[in-house]
Regions:
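N-terminal secretory signal peptides that target proteins for export/translocation
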Residues: 1-4
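Bacterial N-terminal signal peptides
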Residues: 6-15
């Protein structure tokens, strides 16, 4: 391989990496405490491909009368598999989360009846697809204390915040972008923030208008 060809390959690789910028987002609650499992979505104005795509399938387990994980992040069109590991039945319902729950119609959601697991038998499971962006509130008609969430996004750049309330994207295309935050306890979504992704790490802070609920153990 000639020197010129090697140089050309190196130049192409450099140009590809040069267009990937870092955006760091911090989410805190009304009291200034870090919020885990908030969903952060970045919508760049430039076209690109995320190097960390979301999985098109996710499993949500019902165990000890809880949804595990409590917050599931998927792309629009993803398949959700609900698995009942409890020995009693669950009647799972999904409906719009946030303010959307007050104007939702009968067709704006789904219901799944899952029999309890029998000793020595495989757990019962059912699938459902998520075809609209936004938050979905999960509950159970039989056990009113059960509460979980699904968030479907149409942007490839999306992730949940860590226990420290942070979400760091290292592959955002250079240029302007809009950043949105969704959190399960927030009735109305926070206003989006504009950011310019480039050579310097872009840092944004979002503060909720509520105190995040603690997950029931």
């Amino acid at each position: 391989m000639t020197f010129m060809r090697l140089a050309l390959i190196a130049l192409i690789a450099l140009s590809c990496t040069a267009h990937a910028a870092t955006v760091s987002v911090m989410v805190v609650d009304k009291e200034g405490k870090p919020v885990a499992d908030a969903v952060v979505v970045v919508v760049p104005s430039a076209r690109g491909t995320s190097s960390h795509p979301l999985a098109s399938q996710a499993t949500i387990v019902q165990e000890k009368m809880q949804f595990v994980p409590q917050v599931t992040l998927v792309p629009v069109g993803a398949k959700l598999t609900f698995v009942n590991q409890d020995s009693w039945d669950h009647h799972v319902r999904g409906s719009p989360a946030g303010a959307g729950q007050f104007s939702a119609g009968a067709k704006d959601g789904f219901e799944l009846r899952l029999d309890g697991r029998l000793a020595g038998k495989p757990a019962k499971s059912l699938d459902v697809s998520v075809d609209k962006p936004g938050g979905v509130l999960l509950g159970c008609h039989i056990h009113g204390s059960m509460r979980g969430f699904v968030y479907a996004t149409d942007s490839p750049w999306a992730m949940k915040t860590s226990a420290e309330g942070q979400a760091v994207f290292d592959d955002v295309p250079d240029g302007s972008a809009q950043v949105r935050v969704w959190q399960a306890d927030q009735l109305f979504e926070l206003p989006a923030q504009a950011v310019t992704a480039g050579a310097v790490i872009a840092r944004l802070n979002f503060q909720l208008q509520v105190v995040s609920r603690r997950r029931r153990i």
